[in-house]
Amino acid sequence: MKNKFIIFLSIFYLFFLNLYANTTPPFKNISVHEKPIQYNKIVFEDFDNQQIDLKNYNNEIYILNFWATWCAPCKKEMPSLDKLQQNKNIEIFAINLETKNEKKTKKFFKDLKIKNLSIFYDPDLKLVKLFNIRGVPTSVILNKDRKEIARIIGDIDFSNTDFINWLLNTTGNKQ
């Protein structure tokens, strides 16, 4: 009887240890919201001045990455963000906050060998105001209902296995 109790406690402990490990952000610059934040309209533009509205997408996870070509940390994290875009459950929108300059922006992507990401703009800085963006890089993580569940201020390695596992577990648990 005593052995069964010890086995039960061990399993119970391992279960909650695993649960905690999967919900704790792997990087200190990730801020997880206790309650998801709802936004009414998330709209930005592509190179062709076409409006992109998130309500027209159907994914499990959205990442809005706010960046600039002059930003060294943005340059550092962009290849890992490009790699993460290969995940079919994640839709990443790399939103350049500079004045629209197609030549400069495409060169930035070409120099970094970015192949999976598309480039978007926030020409009137409406999203900057909506999301209260204070600097770059900043990444806003939204769940399938397009509610903000977490925010990353500064650069991270988006291809880090611990981050990917945390991201998939967190977005699956937040409603």
Please place each PLM-identified region on the residue numbering.
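Positively charged n-region of N-terminal signal peptides that target proteins for export
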Residues: 1-5
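Short loop/turn microsegments at loop-to-beta-strand junctions
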Residues: 39-40, 62, 136-137
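Short active-site neighborhood of thiol/selenol oxidoreductases, capturing the structured segment around
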Residues: 53-75
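Thiol/disulfide oxidoreductase modules built on the thioredoxin-like
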Residues: 110-115, 122-167
